[in-house]
Amino acid sequence: MSSTTVAEFANELKKTPETLLDQLKSAGVPKAAPTDALTEADKQRLLGFLKASHGTAEPERKKITLTKKSTSEIKQADATGRARTIQVEVRKKRTFIQRDDGHPATPEVQPVAEAPAAAPAAPRIDEAELARREEEARRQAELIRRQEEELAEKRRLREEAEAREREQAEKAERAEQAEQEAARIAAEKKAADAAAAAPAKEAAKPAAAPVAAAAAAAEQQAADTKLAAQTAATQAKEDAKAKAAAESKARADEEAARAKDLDERRRKALAEAEAIRAMMNAPARVLVPHKAPEKPQPEKAAVKGTLHKPAAPAARPGAPAAPGAAAAPGAAGAGKEVKSAKLSSSWAGDPAKKKEIKTRGDASGGVGRGNWRGGPRGRRGSNDRGGHEEHVQAAPVEARILEVHVPETITVAELAHKMAVKAQEVIKQLMKLGQMATINQSLDQDTAMILVEEMGHNAVVAALDDPEAFTDEDVSAQTAEALPRAPVVTVMGHVDHGKTSLLDYIRRAKVAAGEAGGITQHIGAYHVQTERGMVSFLDTPGHEAFTAMRARGAQATDIVILVVAADDGVMPQTKEAIKHAKAAGVPIVVAINKIDKPDASPDRVKQELVAEEVVPEEYGGDVPFVPVSAKTGQGIDDLLEQVLLQAEVLELKAPVDAAAKGLVIEAQLDKGRGPVATVLVQSGTLKTGDVVLAGSTYGRVRAMLDEDGRTIKSAGPSIPVEIQGLTEVPQAGDEFMVMSDERRAREIATYRAGKFRNTKLAKAQAANLQNMFTDLSAGEVQTLRIIIKADVQGSQEALAQSLLKLATDEVKVQIVYAGVGGISESDINLAIASKAIVIGFNVRADAGARKLAEGNGVQLNYYSIIYDAVDEIKVAMSGMLAPERREEIIGSAEIRTVFVASKIGTVAGSYITSGSVNRSAHFRLLRDNVVIYTGEVDSIKRMKDDVREVREGFECGIKLKNYNDIKEGDQLEFFEIKEIARTL
């Protein structure tokens, strides 16, 4: 029974607690403080006293009844399986009894208390009767609610049973038994609640016999109500079963009739479609033009045409109808217009129509796959839905299957426009294919073509409508006589095998001495005038990091000189150079260098090269082998003779009086001269003032320098030169050509830059989505962020590739930015924002950048040899690796006694059998030589004193942390965990 305090009740009555205490005291309810509990019996006693004190006049003002109504909606499937919305209205009624205002009792009221049992008896009986009726109403409401719940549960179980009534009949029986058991338990619980409420009701009504009789009558009525409810529930179950069986049979009959009707309508629709198609394919007749009537007569049923096709012959008044238009008189007799885009009014709402390809074009209907035509789109497409006005309908056309030209990258919006559909439809199809995309996101060509095919159109690789298509026309329009040109020879081989030294002897220069570390770190281009003619040489790096440079050198060359040290043999980069030369399809001349050394073995080199499918001429192959010495000059003349002999066989020719074309060998950003590119002219003549297009950059040639730094005015075929005047630093390996005007060059460069950006963005988005779950599953991975600035493009590319190869599963390398030129303040700001380190390869930072780096703690690293840069980055990555944890056993002990202390717990009295034990050690508990627990030592005591360490041969008490299950005879093994730094 609920109870409240005097203060809470006074707050509800809007009285002061002191006033309520006085009234309670006058009513004979002993309450001394506002915090005392106030029961319902006390409230009834106070109510009776107040009624007796103030009389029972104006009873209509004593009670106020409020009715509250709330409406909600639920969705429930009907017998046909369709979801319907049901309005649920809940009504609540609450009665408030108006209390009298709290005024202290006056002395004139005291005589009323002489006979307290006579006067208040009648109102108390009325209140008891009211309470009994309210209790009965609540009981009835509870019974009705339970019945509704049972009926709802039965309905749900029935619907589930209907879906699988053939194979799960016994399961339905068990569900029904469970339902009956739940109803019985609910009834018993309700009876128990009523029995529990009876004593409280008796305590609230001590007035005796009439009240007891009323309570007995109420119990009897409750029992009768319960019996009636059970009988009604049983009857409702039987009725529900019969109704469910009838509904199931009716649904089966209805579905069979609907299927039959649908087949009939489809057959008629196909027949009408064939008739309309025959009418449209009939030869057109020449009609006399006349003004169309303002409003056609209803009896003249006609098939309207589109704006692009003449109307069908049946549309002319008085003309004979087409053979396929036999259905028109019936439609005219019904007084309705024939809809060419609509085969059946009932089939127009079929859900299968929604699966067709949606287009922005003529949506009035057309024959699609399987000769099925979609109905009209929008609200105005229904038959006579807009009132009495007539609608001009388009003639039936075949479903449009478009030929969509897909470029390398295309946004979702552009692709939707090409297919004449909404962008939302394209996004939905992408989601079905497992890719999330926005309306402005770029798609790569493969994804876009798959998407077009999925949407029922034909995808075609687009013939790019770009300005580059006109460059070939400009070049082909030029006619110039092809003249013999000098061969371009690339020197390739392993690092430190003497490639640059060999070229130095040929050029009579000392280039190798000027290279950092004595190794070549960028492509060197030279042309040498020999007694037998001119030869252009490209010196490529031999270090493993410069793979891309060697590949570019092989593409631009005519002949490859493969340098192999006689004392070292074939090495990894030698094999790689052979692959590059064979991929480029250029002949190879092998130079066996360092034959002047005592340990030189040319025969071993030949055997190793034969294993790589480079067979010398003396073994029946086609590759000349020349033993040379870059130190003494032995064999140099023979090598040049072999090179020129190969050039004569190739018959190298190129036009001279034409616009220049060639290849960018190397590029860099010079602080004083701006972007500088080393180019190799392959055909034509490059002159000062020409407009050059190189990749996505362009510019006018301001100056040209040869390999010796001398200014020249022109350069013919096979001549390497250094040009200035480009807008940006080009990519090494890009092709360059001379354009007719600067405007055309700017257009092409801008187009290439945008195309490169879109392609890069599409690939980056695909990579991000692809690696999303991989990154989540991999956990936290350390990342070393690096900014690279190098002197030339090739060195920057090689260094970036070498550092990316150092990445492991635990530490990754992220190249935040890589470029050429000195380190500027913008590079330092980028490093601050991305928390990266800055590497300068053969470049330095200016004063402003150094000051900014020192003030913000940015690490600057300068290198001139790629070995040093790779080694130091590897050390830095090793420091980011998580240390390796190793266990080192330090001792063991035997438990001889077990002590149990109330405040401490279980203590192991142990004897140290080997090694020692300290308080920071870990332990393993062994029982019968089986490890049963591993943990940490809590404390060690010896003779009641805490000690840090106990050595072999001593006894001590050991308290194990969070473990007490120890026995005599157990073994303790102590160990320490040490962290050891890992390396890559």
UniProtKB/Swiss-Prot annotation:
Tree of life domain: Bacteria
Keywords per UniProt: Cytoplasm, GTP-binding, Initiation factor, Nucleotide-binding, Protein biosynthesis
InterPro entries reported in the protein's UniProt record: DNA-bd_dom_put_sf, EF-G-like_DII, EFTu-like_2, IF2_assoc_dom_bac, IF2_II, IF2_N, P-loop_NTPase, Small_GTP-bd
Subcellular location, principal: cytoplasm
tr-type G domain residues: 484-653
Stored Pfam families: EF-G_D2, GTP_EFTU, GTP_EFTU_D2, IF-2, IF2_assoc, IF2_N
Cellular component terms (Gene Ontology): cytosol
Residues involved in GTP binding: 493-500, 539-543, 593-596
Presence of keyword Flavoprotein: no
Compositionally biased region (Low complexity): 104-123, 193-235, 310-335
Localization annotation: Cytoplasm
Region (G4): 593-596
Basic and acidic residues biased stretches: 124-177, 236-267, 291-302, 351-361, 381-392
Annotated region described as Disordered, given as residue ranges: 92-267, 280-392
CDD domains: IF2_eIF5B, IF2_mtIF2_II, mtIF2_IVc
Chain segments carrying region G1: 493-500
Region annotation (G2) ranges: 518-522
Keyword Transport applies: no
One annotated GO molecular function: GTPase activity
Biased segments, Gly residues type: 363-375
Region called G3, residue ranges: 539-542
Family membership noted in the UniProt record: Belongs to the TRAFAC class translation factor GTPase superfamily. Classic translation factor GTPase family. IF-2 subfamily.
Purpose of the protein: One of the essential components for the initiation of protein synthesis. Protects formylmethionyl-tRNA from spontaneous hydrolysis and promotes its binding to the 30S ribosomal subunits. Also involved in the hydrolysis of GTP during the formation of the 70S ribosomal complex.
Protein name: Translation initiation factor IF-2
Originating species: Variovorax paradoxus (strain S110)
Gene: infB
